[in-house]
Design a protein with these regions (language model features):
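Cell-envelope/extracellular polymer assembly enzymes that use nucleotide-activated donors
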Residues: 2-5, 38
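Short beta-strand/turn micro-motifs composed of small residues
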Residues: 6-8, 41-45, 98, 124
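Short acidic, S/G/P-rich loop/turn micro-motifs used as interaction or catalytic elements
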Residues: 9-14, 46-48, 101-104, 129-130, ...
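Short, well-formed alpha-helical segments that are part of the catalytic scaffolds
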Residues: 12-30
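C-terminal catalytic/acceptor-binding lobe
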Residues: 18, 169-291
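Active-site-proximal specificity loops/subdomain of glycosyltransferases
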Residues: 45-91
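Short beta-strand-to-loop acidic/aromatic patch adjacent to the donor-nucleotide binding site
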Residues: 92-103
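Conserved catalytic core of nucleotide-sugar-dependent glycosyltransferases
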Residues: 103-179
Length: 291
């Protein structure tokens, strides 16, 4: 299943066009895909122009709305996304992170996304030059390049990646965070999670620059780099968590006592000088007793 997550504000927002987004979803989803896509939308409680229930009832797929305070507006997008993530249908394998000024343009995108077997995956319209920023991604000039290398993106990200990373990057631009995480993953482990999809959406609004004052000194926008460089250390920790889950698996059930991985771990944990003696004792235990 595909969960589409976004925040919408009608009041004072001329770029908002939710009817066009949802109408395009009807046009470009097949009848047997409509139970495989859901929309989770957050509204501000002071937005008295948000659509009524009757507007949403006419659509042939699940649409769930949530309403709470505006807070810091756009700067709080990641907090809203984290909550919407926890409310998604538990069958969902992928998230589409979008906005209410996008609309769909190609039929079949739902089935195409859901056909991807990868447990850890990021999908966008293009494949940015991730490898080009290895070793230099913290430099100010490099940040200005990789931060816009993906274009106007409404990213698809696997649910498992968010479960392992535990958030959407400590700031409101999920596409910038996913690009940064991708660069760090390649820099540390030579792993690339990014896939390119044939374009299936367009945007009528524009970049949300997010340059109004905010408490968050880790905000990353088209014009501003993170003021708190600890953000990059947090990214490296996320990258390591992803790597360890890829290598060791994401199954939370305890391993069998006799599993190869557990036995190898126990073997490696022993001081090397004890191994010959332990092997000798094990061999003795296996010999038949005299008499």
């Amino acid at each position: 299943m595909l969960s589409v997550l976004f925040c919408s504000r009608v009041k004072g927002n001329p770029a908002s066009n939710l009817p066009k987004l949802l109408d395009s979803a009807v046009k470009h989803t097949l009848p047997d895909e409509r139970d495989k896509i859901e929309f989770l939308i957050k509204y501000d409680d002071d937005d008295d122009q948000r659509p009524p229930d009757s507007f949403f009832a006419r659509y042939p797929f699940t649409i769930r709305r949530f309403v709470w305070s505006r807070g810091e507006g756009r700067h709080g997008l990641h907090h809203a996304q984290e909550y919407l993530f926890t409310q998604r249908d538990p069958r969902a394998r992928f998230l589409l992170m979008t906005a209410d000024d996008f609309y769909f343009t190609r039929t079949g995108f739902v089935s195409e996304i859901l056909s991807v077997p990868d447990e850890f995956c990021i999908m966008g319209h293009n494949r940015p030059p991730i490898e080009a920023f290895a070793g230099i991604y913290e430099q100010e000039s490099a940040i200005r390049q990789w931060n816009v290398a993906f274009g106007e993106m409404s990213p698809v990200v696997s649910v498992r990646l968010i479960e392992v990373c535990q958030n959407f990057g400590w700031q409101s631009n999920v596409d910038s965070w996913l690009m940064a995480l991708s660069v760090v993953l390649y820099d540390m482990y030579k792993i690339v999670l990014w896939r390119a999809l044939t374009p299936y959406y367009l945007r009528e609004g524009g970049y949300g620059l997010g340059d109004t004052p905010t408490y968050n000194n880790m905000e990353l926008t088209a014009r501003k780099n993170p003021g708190n460089k600890y953000w990059f250390e947090l990214l490296r920790r996320q990258a390591r968590n992803v790597y360890l889950n890829i290598v060791h698996g994401t199954d939370l059930r305890p391993e069998s006592f006799w599993s190869p991985h557990r036995l190898w771990w126990k073997l490696r944990s022993q001081p090397i000088h004890q191994l010959p003696l332990r092997a000798y004792r094990a061999a003795l235990r296996g010999l038949p007793k005299a008499g």
